[in-house]
Every structure is written in structure tokens, then in C-alpha cells.
């Protein structure tokens, strides 16, 4: 399964949407590397690339939330921590195996892609709506 950015994932915040597209691209690069090479080193390097960008993106989102005094920021951070744990678990899977297995790919699909879709459609969209509503009320 490849991750796809479609209209259902648009939050209306250009920065967030652009970063989500990049995040999805990095997830797909990880999946592609698992298909084209069963090499453990390649998988670890590609997972590093995804993990680094995820940290950058989470930092940007959390800074945005702080700047708009988003009331559910702590809950949002806990959701980010869930994906951090998933990424750590993926590293552990790679450590225990010779390379990316079918089970590894299944975990990326289930615990990264599905998590990301739910997170964007719920948490991130609510942040973008809150920001938009605050900006709209300030103009009145």
C-alpha cells in the first residue's frame, strides 16, 4: 500500500499541507526501499530519513499550536508521541531481522500510514480550523 495525499487530507493550512505531502513522500520512499532492496542498512537509512523529517514536522506543528494558544496542544503532543513510539518499534524490528520483512512493511502500512491519515483528518484539521477561526474573529 502506498500513501497518497488527496483532498480528504487537506487541512487548509499551506505549511501543514506541504509538510504532510513531504511526509507521505518519505513514507513511500521507505516502502519503495523495502520493495527494491531487502538490505537492512538501506532500510535503516531510509527510516532515519523519515524519522528526522517527522521530528521536524512535529516541531513545526507544535510551534504553530503554541503561537495560536491551541487549547488541545498537550493531547496533540501525546498523539505525536504515539508515532514516535511506532518509529522506535520499527527500528527494533529492523534490529531483530536481516532486513525489512513483510511484517515490517505491514507495520509501516498499519501503524504509520493509517495513523497519519487519522491524525491529519482529526487532530491536524482541528488545529487548522482553530487557527482559521481565530484569524477570522480577529478581523471582525
Where do the PLM segments sit?
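Small-residue-biased structural context
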Residues: 1-140
